[in-house]
A protein has these predicted regions:
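Short, hydrophobic/aromatic beta-strand segments
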Residues: 8-10, 44, 51-62, 147, ...
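N-terminal edge beta-strand
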Residues: 13-33, 209-219
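Surface-exposed loops/turns
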Residues: 35-37, 127, 224-225
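Short solvent-exposed strand-capping/beta-turn motif centered on an Asx-Ser/Thr pair
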Residues: 38, 46-50, 233-238
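Divalent metal-coordination and catalytic microenvironments
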Residues: 43, 63, 135, 183, ...
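Extracellular/periplasmic metallocenter environments
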Residues: 48-163, 269-272
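Histidine- and aromatic-rich segments of cupredoxin/plastocyanin-like copper-binding domains
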Residues: 70-93, 101, 185-272
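Low-complexity, Pro/Ser/Thr- and charge-rich linker/hinge segments at domain boundaries
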Residues: 157-177
């Protein structure tokens, strides 16, 4: 739970986040997780959401890592939700935390077993680089994710290594570090007092009238005169987007399109 300001003209309000800790032990909301193929990750998720909350969403949670190949017990099925007092139909009992195991393997492990040249195993053509994690509680996936429970999970390998100065000549050497920028887009609705609202009973879905990027309404990113890697994620429940880069005169700018739905394309496409 965090006090959050979506825009300077809007009041501070409570949102629900996953909270990690940096190297100094400081809390960090919805941390971007950096992983590598062949290096498993065990993530322990504590649920400290209040049972007597106000507003939309539910304090029962089920963490789902979207699109990665994971064991079924760590997939975050909708029925795997839990809290200190409740548990879903596919959980044995309530609890304070749940461990998630992410082996970080490629698809096709049976067809392409581990070897000296492929220590992670699987089909490296199936590598996924840009993933995200979010809540997937039964009947409340959209509400809980919209309330703030979503973040990035970036996974690297020898080709997409996360190092633009990689000495490996076969690496793509894409922009990295501060120049590799994940951007999560969510459309949201706010009432006349500037408080976020969500109609979780509308079967047709909810379209927001404000677009947030990484939790801020229409933020500005100051950039250097160099190449950037932008990872664009639609983290909202209903809206579709068409993205364009324009200059101050509203003229279209070119960019290189390198991935879709988490996968690198066979070859980059130049937007003209």
């Amino acid at each position: 739970i965090e006090d959050h300001v979506f825009h300077p003209n809007y009041p501070s309000q409570l949102v629900w986040n996953y909270v990690g800790k940096d190297a100094n032990g400081n809390p960090y909301p919805n941390p971007t997780i950096h992983a590598r193929y062949g290096r498993p990750v065990v993530l322990r998720l504590y649920n400290d959401l209040p049972e007597d909350h106000t507003g939309f969403g539910t304090p029962e949670i089920s963490l789902h890592l979207h699109n990665l190949h994971t064991p079924s017990e760590s997939d975050g099925f909708p029925g795997d939700y839990f809290s200190k007092t409740k548990s879903g139909p596919t959980m044995s009992r309530p609890g304070e935390f749940k461990d998630q195991f992410y082996p970080n393997i490629y698809a096709g492990l049976d067809e392409f077993p581990r070897s000296a040249s492929n220590p992670a195993g699987g089909d490296r053509r199936e590598a996924l680089g840009t993933l995200w994690y979010h809540d997937r509680c039964l009947d409340f996936t959209a509400a809980n994710a919209t309330r703030g429970m979503a973040g990035f999970y970036l996974i690297y390998d020898a080709l997409d290594s996360g190092n633009e100065n990689d000495p490996n000549s076969s690496a793509l050497r894409l922009p990295s570090g501060a120049y590799d920028y994940p951007l999560a887009f969510q459309d949201k609705r706010f009432d006349s007092n500037g408080i976020q609202v969500f109609d979780q009973l509308d079967p047709e879905g909810t379209l927001g009238d404000k677009i947030t990027v990484n939790g801020k309404i229409e933020p500005v990113l100051r950039v250097a005169r160099r190449k950037y890697r932008l990872r664009l994620l639609n983290a909202g429940p209903s809206r579709y987007y068409e993205f364009y880069f324009v200059n101050n005169a509203n003229g279209l700018q070119t960019f290189t399109y390198i991935a879709n739905d988490g996968n690198l394309l066979p070859a980059p496409l130049i937007n003209r």
